[in-house]
C-alpha cells in the first residue's frame, strides 16, 4: 500500500500506470493541443464523469487550502485493516481522518480501532458533503470509497 496522492490529470479521471511505462503516467492533458478532439480545459469539453471528478477535486483542494490541521498537524498512519486504510492528522484540538476502502466491495470502518484519534467525539463532518458522520458505530463504506471527516 502506498500513500494516496494526486497526479496532474487526476481531476479529470486521467490514469496510467508505471507497469506500461513511466511516460504512461505523464500523458498530455486532453485539450489545448492541435488535433485534440477531447478538451478537459472547459466544462463543456468534459464528460459527466470527468466533470463530477473535477468538482470533487476542486472542493477537496479548496477545503485543504489554509487548513492548519492539514498544513501543520501531526500525522498518524494506521496499518491497513480488512482493506481499509486510515491516515489521521491532528492540530490545535482538531482532527481529520482520511479513510479509504481499498476493496471492490462494501466494507466497514471499525471505529473502536481508532479510539486514540476519535477520543470522546461522537460525530464528525464529511468535508465534501457536509453530512454528519456518527462516530458511535462502525462506518459503512462503499466499494473503493474515500471519506474525509473532521471533528
Where in this protein do the model-derived segments appear?
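Loop/helix patches that line or flank the sugar-binding groove of alpha-linked glycan CAZymes
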Residues: 1-118, 141
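Short, surface-exposed, polar/charged, turn-prone segments marking secondary-structure boundaries
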Residues: 33-37, 124-128, 151
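A residue-level signal for conserved active-site and pocket-lining positions in enzyme catalytic cores
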Residues: 60, 124, 144
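Residue-level marker of intrinsically disordered, low-complexity segments enriched
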Residues: 68, 82, 94, 125-126, ...
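Solvent-exposed beta-hairpin/edge-strand motifs
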Residues: 114-130
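C-terminal beta-strand-rich structural cap/linker in extracellular carbohydrate-active enzymes
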Residues: 134-151
